[in-house]
């Protein structure tokens, strides 16, 4: 399965905090990622998307565009924001694969 490409601009990447910009993305990806991150102990993840008039698809002026921003913070000493991001991505990929299998199975049953 070919996944869509996602542009990611890493603003900060250390144990305590990861700051990302996700140009061209919307609440769909940001909310999923935030959900997977916040399920982990010692991690707080938030994101911000500016008003749609400043979004990529509605931009009037290239310089006014503000990409979505995600902040991942480790709030416990033993938590690592970088590792949390990697775990969240892996978890989401597994969930997508499971959903794909469920849909395929349901479609095969319907066809028989």
From Swiss-Prot:
EC number annotated for this UniProt entry: 2.7.7.6
Broad enzyme group: transferase
One record GO biological process: DNA-templated transcription
Catalytic activity reported: RNA(n) + a ribonucleoside 5'-triphosphate = RNA(n+1) + diphosphate
This protein's UniProt keywords: Cytoplasm, DNA-directed RNA polymerase, Nucleotidyltransferase, Transcription, Transferase
CC per GO annotation: cytoplasm; DNA-directed RNA polymerase complex
Statement: the UniProt record of this protein carries the keyword Transferase: yes
GO molecular function annotation: DNA binding; DNA-directed RNA polymerase activity; protein dimerization activity
Subcellular location: Cytoplasm
Annotated Pfam families: RNA_pol_L_2 (PF13656)
Function: DNA-dependent RNA polymerase (RNAP) catalyzes the transcription of DNA into RNA using the four ribonucleoside triphosphates as substrates.
Subunit annotation: Part of the RNA polymerase complex.
Protein family according to the UniProt entry: Belongs to the archaeal Rpo11/eukaryotic RPB11/RPC19 RNA polymerase subunit family.
Descriptive protein name: DNA-directed RNA polymerase subunit Rpo11
């Amino acid at each position: 399965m070919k996944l869509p490409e996602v542009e990611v601009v890493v603003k900060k990447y250390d144990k305590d905090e990861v700051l990302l910009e996700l140009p061209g993305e919307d609440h769909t990806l940001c909310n999923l990622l935030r959900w997977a991150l916040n399920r982990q102990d010692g991690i707080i993840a938030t994101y911000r998307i500016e008003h749609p008039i400043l979004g990529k698809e509605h931009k009037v002026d290239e310089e006014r565009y503000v990409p979505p921003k995600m902040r991942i913070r480790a709030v416990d000493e033993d938590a690592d924001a970088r590792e949390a991001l990697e775990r969240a991505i892996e978890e989401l990929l597994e969930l997508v694969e499971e959903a794909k299998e469920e849909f395929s199975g349901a479609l095969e049953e319907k066809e028989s």
